[in-house]
Amino acid sequence: MNSMKGKRVIITGPTSGVGKEIALQLAALGADVILGCRDTQKGEEIAAEIISRTSSSKPVVMQLDTSSQKSIRDFAREFRRKHRTLDVLINNAGGNRGTLPKVTSVDGIELTFATNVLGYFLLTQELLDVLKKRASARIINVASAYASDLDLDDLQFERRRFESFRAYAQSKACDRMLTWALARRLAGSSVTANAMTPGLITETALYRHAD
């Protein structure tokens, strides 16, 4: 694989599953990894594991709750204060509430949609200027094979009975659509946007809450 030495990468949701493996692999390739974590204590534990397993420089842990618009803006503001450029943004943080009832975010939005869709969108918008300063930058949105049809008239489950997996599946369909729209918007620029479907990884909260 190509070296990532000198490349600055933000990964959201890096404390388990897909995000953790991405962080490990990119650190091993020499990338300067920034871990956007809701739980910074877990983030520090992952950073220590990355160092021990890859002999890379210490990843930077920053607090980020992608269900909160304020947290996203604070994260982006702090990043821009410290760094002028960004090479790769990996929007991976996501959630599925399993058998738990519907919950809204601090902004009053159904939590799955707030985290998995609006979180991707807002963080990308907040960091687009620093991505565009690189000659070849990447936005990668982690999607899912479980993406399903949308009910555009009831994305917030205000009329339908809330089903956590349906909420997750429609959020991942939105992520695909978001990526397509973003790719068209960025055509001809130095930034490309792609969605990826990683397959099933069982060591995640999403898998544990699947019953």
Labelled PLM ranges:
Residues 2-37:
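Canonical Rossmann dinucleotide-binding motif of NAD(H)/NADP(H)-dependent dehydrogenases/reductases
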Residues 8-11, 89-90, 139:
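Conserved hydrophobic beta-strands of the Rossmann-like cofactor-binding core
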Residues 36-40, 44, 66:
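N-terminal Rossmann-fold cofactor-binding loop
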Residues 52-70:
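Rossmann-fold cofactor-recognition segment
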Residues 60, 70, 74-81, 99-114:
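Active-site Tyr-X3-Lys motif and surrounding loop/helix of classical short-chain dehydrogenase/reductase
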Residues 95-102, 109-113, 132-191, 197-211:
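Catalytic loop of short-chain dehydrogenase/reductase
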Residues 124-125, 180:
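A short, exposed helix-loop element centered on a Lys and neighboring polar residues
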